[in-house]
């Protein structure tokens, strides 16, 4: 398998799609699949499928294809989805509640271990067995579970845009090195560095994924203009 830093982001995104396709094939009791079949279902070319998979190992047999269950298992392992990832959610409004209540995350070893907010009418409520804590308790909570099976790996931000950067900095200061940001603002990652006490040797970078569903709608709007799309007349 190639080093993580050498694998293009777009490739990782497509591999996530391949895993979904493989799951669908398994549900249909399909035992083997060709790169052509995977490509057709994923909306890419067979060459692209084969190229993407070479980053993660050697799979399949020419003329026979891939064993669906084996390829799915190996891709899950390659993406680290064969191990548990503990998650805290910061911001328990409607979106935070929806994510906390979503059962599918646990299928991929993502476990919610902490919920946080600042609103007095929200703090203290219970969601799926977890009590929502005040944001001021984030650091002590993360420290209290460090080195245990409940150690926090990722933070999900579902806070208003104006509070996102500060919330991200609070997560990083507590030692959380991965952030999935649902707030409608791009986090300034140059300001996010893990404290030396929490960072691996030679690595203090924080991994941030910004999720913007409106971006998808904007792209869709453009493509729906059709082939005649062009600059507006002045």
Swiss-Prot record:
SMART domains (alphabetical): CoA_binding
Q: Where does NAD(+) bind?
A: 91-96
Q: Which GO terms describe its biological process?
A: negative regulation of DNA-templated transcription; response to redox state
Recorded GO molecular functions are: DNA binding; DNA-binding transcription factor activity
State the compartments where it is located: Cytoplasm
Q: Which InterPro entries match?
A: CoA-bd, NAD(P)-bd_dom_sf, Rex_DNA-bd_C_dom, Tscrpt_rep_Rex, WH-like_DNA-bd_sf, WH_DNA-bd_sf
**Keywords, ordered alphabetically:** Cytoplasm, DNA-binding, NAD, Repressor, Transcription, Transcription regulation
Per the record, the similarity remark reads: Belongs to the transcriptional regulatory Rex family.
Question: What function is annotated for this protein?
Answer: Modulates transcription in response to changes in cellular NADH/NAD(+) redox state.
Q: How does it assemble?
A: Homodimer.
Name of this protein: Redox-sensing transcriptional repressor Rex
Q: Which organism is it from?
A: Deinococcus radiodurans (strain ATCC 13939 / DSM 20539 / JCM 16871 / CCUG 27074 / LMG 4051 / NBRC 15346 / NCIMB 9279 / VKM B-1422 / R1)
């Amino acid at each position: 398998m190639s080093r993580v830093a050498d694998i293009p982001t777009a490739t990782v995104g497509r591999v996530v799609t391949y895993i979904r396709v493989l799951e669908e094939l398994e549900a249909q009791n399909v035992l083997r699949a060709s790169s052509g079949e995977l490509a057709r279902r994923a909306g890419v070319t067979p060459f692209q499928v084969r190229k993407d998979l070479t980053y993660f190992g050697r799979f399949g047999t020419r003329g026979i294809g891939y064993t669906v269950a084996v390829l799915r298992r190996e891709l899950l392992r390659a993406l680290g989805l064969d191990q548990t990832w503990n998650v805290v959610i910061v911001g328990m409004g409607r979106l935070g509640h929806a994510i906390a209540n979503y059962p599918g995350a646990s299928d991929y070893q993502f476990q919610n271990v902490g919920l946080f907010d600042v609103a007095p009418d929200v703090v203290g409520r219970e969601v799926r067995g977890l009590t929502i804590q005040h944001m001021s308790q984030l650091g002590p909570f993360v420290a209290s579970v460090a080195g245990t099976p409940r150690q926090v790996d990722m933070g999900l931000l579902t806070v208003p845009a104006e509070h996102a950067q500060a919330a991200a900095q609070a997560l990083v200061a507590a030692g959380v090195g991965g952030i999935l940001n649902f707030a409608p603002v791009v986090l300034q990652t140059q300001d996010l560095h893990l404290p030396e006490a929490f960072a691996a040797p030679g690595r203090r970078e924080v991994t941030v994924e910004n999720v913007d569903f409106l971006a998808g709608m904007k792209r869709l709007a453009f493509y729906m203009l059709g082939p005649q799309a062009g600059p507006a007349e002045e």
